[in-house]
């Protein structure tokens, strides 16, 4: 079948040269597109690919840097937590030590106050015993003078009698106390 003999209607060339010129023009246009347009498109595609690839690489680098920074901050945070725990433990131990020292000081002060109070009580007791002995001695001498009917003016003899009387009184209550304790 011959192309020229086909019924192409309005598309049918009037002269066979038109087909040759058409084919040459199509080949020329194809060559022109291949030499001028395609390299530009390829260049644009390559630039676009490089831009995208560079963006991806930059994003990956940024992500890696962010991950490294996150790990660094997490390590610093863990270190800070450990340090805070250490400081808290030190503060607790120092607080316990301070409390122990304050208790010891308070106990020493309480012991000193108790000792001072006991000494003062003992001094007051001794003073009261001396005063009571002197008064009892005077009363005993007066009573003895009335009973005997004579004046007991010899101080040494009076003092010896009073001391003997008081020591017998001192022995009696402790003996009666021991009897009371044994009964209980």
Curated annotation (Swiss-Prot):
One of its GO terms (molecular function) is proton-transporting ATP synthase activity, rotational mechanism. The chain crosses the membrane at residues 19-39. The gene is atpF. One of its GO terms (cellular component) is proton-transporting ATP synthase complex. It comes from the Bacteria. It is a single-pass membrane protein. Belongs to the ATPase B chain family. It holds the Pfam family ATP-synt_B. CDD domains: ATP-synt_Fo_b (cd06503). HAMAP family: ATP_synth_b_bprime. This is ATP synthase subunit b. F-type ATPases have 2 components, F(1) - the catalytic core - and F(0) - the membrane proton channel. F(1) has five subunits: alpha(3), beta(3), gamma(1), delta(1), epsilon(1). F(0) has three main subunits: a(1), b(2) and c(10-14). The alpha and beta chains form an alternating ring which encloses part of the gamma chain. F(1) is attached to F(0) by a central stalk formed by the gamma and epsilon chains, while a peripheral stalk is formed by the delta and b chains. F(1)F(0) ATP synthase produces ATP from ADP in the presence of a proton or sodium gradient. F-type ATPases consist of two structural domains, F(1) containing the extramembraneous catalytic core and F(0) containing the membrane proton channel, linked together by a central stalk and a peripheral stalk. During catalysis, ATP synthesis in the catalytic domain of F(1) is coupled via a rotary mechanism of the central stalk subunits to proton translocation. Component of the F(0) channel, it forms part of the peripheral stalk, linking F(1) to F(0). Its main location: membrane. Keywords: ATP synthesis, Cell membrane, CF(0), Hydrogen ion transport, Ion transport, Membrane, Transmembrane, Transmembrane helix, Transport. It is found in: Cell membrane.
């Amino acid at each position: 079948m011959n192309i020229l003999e086909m019924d192409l209607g309005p598309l049918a060339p009037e002269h066979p040269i038109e087909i040759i010129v058409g084919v040459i023009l199509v080949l020329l246009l194809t060559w022109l597109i291949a030499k001028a347009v395609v390299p530009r498109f390829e260049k644009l595609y390559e630039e676009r690919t490089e831009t995208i690839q560079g963006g991806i690489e930059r994003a990956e680098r940024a992500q890696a840097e962010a991950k490294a920074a996150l790990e660094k901050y997490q390590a610093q945070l863990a270190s800070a937590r450990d340090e805070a725990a250490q400081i808290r433990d030190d503060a607790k131990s120092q607080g316990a030590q301070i409390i122990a020292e304050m208790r010891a000081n308070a106990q020493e002060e309480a012991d000193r106050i108790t000792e001072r109070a006991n000494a003062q009580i003992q001094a007051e007791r001794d003073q009261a015993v001396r005063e009571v002995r002197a008064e009892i001695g005077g009363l005993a001498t007066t009573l003895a003078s009335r009973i005997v009917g004579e004046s007991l003016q010899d101080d040494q003899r009076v003092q010896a009698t009073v001391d003997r009387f008081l020591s017998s009184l001192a022995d009696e209550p402790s003996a009666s106390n021991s009897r009371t304790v044994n009964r209980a």
